[in-house]
Amino acid sequence: MVNIRPDEISSIIRKQIEQYNQEVKVVNIGTVLQVGDGIARIYGLDKVMAGELLEFEDGTVGIALNLESDNVGAVLMGDGLNIQEGSSVKATGKIAQIPVSDGYLGRVVNALGRPIDGKGDIPASEYRLIESPAPGIISRRSVYEPMQTGLIAIDAMIPIGRGQRELIIGDRQTGKTAVATDTILNQKGQNVICVYVAIGQKASSIAQVLNTFEERGAMDYTIIVAETADAPATLQYLAPYTGAAIAEYFMYRGKHTLVIYDDLSKQAQAYRQMSLLLRRPPGREAYPGDVFYLHSRLLERAAKLSSQLGEGSMTALPIVETQAGDVSAYIPTNVISITDGQIFLSADLFNAGIRPAINVGISVSRVGSAAQIKAMKQVAGKLKLELAQFAELEAFSQFASDLDKATQNQLARGQRLRELLKQSQAAPLAVEEQVATIYTGVNGYLDVIEVAQVRRFLTELRQYLGTNKPKFGEIIREKKAVTEEAESLLKAAIKEHTEAFLLQEESVGSRS
């Protein structure tokens, strides 16, 4: 038998007494009455707050949304398959927040800020609330810096500024995501941090976007927040707010950010599902009464901050899907009324081969030329007017048999301008290239080129300018205006290239 020394026992007891800590914890606990379809009804939890996080026995987390007289309705951030009726629920006393840091750049995370790209944990420097209040009037200043998308049709006629909210709206398969991803690709070297939020999309579509970003080196300044179509409705509803919280972290540090919500129709559907299961009264199109507030509190977080707050900005490009071009449906009208303009993509234009399929007539930017550099204002003013007149004339000319020479010339010019706006996907243009392209079109230099050859002519002209007249690009970038020197350089380049191009066409024609 082992000898037990009394002094050893007494020292152990003394140590235990010294370390004894009498701490009383008050925990608010409830009982699950009913669970299913991502919703739990809980009895008890008298002191719970709206939006408070709840912890279930199996570790699942929920959010208390409905506070009723005899029970609490909570939405689950998980499948809830292991939650049983009668099990206990703990109120955590916290509301939803996510870790944030510079380490998020180049990563793919879910709506709770957890990495899902298999590259390990992300070190967090601080936590931010998923839903935080938008900056007030005094905290903001008006939008004045351009946010170049790299798409001529947008930068010339529907300009977007840093801190603006511009809706991208259109039917399915009209190139909405392409416009948004091209804008991200164009931010390379512009010191803009991009957040792409994918809500309820196919995993294959998100993988495709990620692949494009990686190939073009865009992941260096981009964060992807993704919740796929098979994710619980709660997480699809939270994803946009998470994206906004990550962007806010950078915005309040004086950086410029761009957030794309792809798309808010799916978020509204997820919220409708949650609300109907919580038995909230349905309104128009079965959406709950506060679906406007769902989007307004998200989009109001986009801002251009005042100089006292560091002049950071958050530009939001929400995407909304329409059914058969119906812009007057509930969600589209809501988001149109919240945003500072919309880019309308038309299925008819897309099918006619006009891509990006932007309907310039319906699209508008409420910030306007305040978000353009002087060089763009100098050349783009004429473009919108000429295209509007062309659209009118084209409709009229279908019924008229003989047209006078002036009308024929105007129609020919319009067709060339329409060609000028066409761009391939993932090929955004620098602002100096856009200025040169538009100048060539509106000043009639394309009138001698066949319509079918316009795109090739312009591509070669841009290459010619960059190689033989690099001074032009430097002037536009530095002075941000078309000076006399820049104009003479551009005119010389157009003249030289046109002569060479027409000679080449003649020789090809004579050979065939």
From Swiss-Prot:
Give the residues the record marks as binding ATP: 170-177
Gene Ontology cellular component list = chloroplast thylakoid membrane; proton-transporting ATP synthase complex
Concerning SUPFAM superfamilies, the annotation shows: C-terminal domain of alpha and beta subunits of F1 ATP synthase, N-terminal domain of alpha and beta subunits of F1 ATP synthase, P-loop containing nucleoside triphosphate hydrolases
Supply one GO molecular-function term: ATP binding
The membrane topology of this protein is: Peripheral membrane protein
Q: Where does the protein principally reside?
A: plastid
Q: Which EC numbers does the record give?
A: 7.1.2.2
Q: Which cellular compartments is it found in? A: Plastid, Chloroplast thylakoid membrane
Q: Where is this site: Required for activity?
A: 363
Keywords from UniProt, A to Z, are:
ATP synthesis, ATP-binding, CF(1), Chloroplast, Hydrogen ion transport, Ion transport, Membrane, Nucleotide-binding, Plastid, Thylakoid, Translocase, Transport
Q: Which reaction does it catalyse?
A: ATP + H2O + 4 H(+)(in) = ADP + phosphate + 5 H(+)(out)
Instruction: Give the domain of life.
Output: Eukaryota
Q: Tell me how this protein assembles.
A: F-type ATPases have 2 components, CF(1) - the catalytic core - and CF(0) - the membrane proton channel. CF(1) has five subunits: alpha(3), beta(3), gamma(1), delta(1), epsilon(1). CF(0) has four main subunits: a, b, b' and c.
Described purpose of this protein according to its UniProt entry: Produces ATP from ADP in the presence of a proton gradient across the membrane. The alpha chain is a regulatory subunit.
The record's similarity note reads:
Belongs to the ATPase alpha/beta chains family.
This chain belongs to which protein, by name? ATP synthase subunit alpha, chloroplastic
Organism of derivation: Staurastrum punctulatum
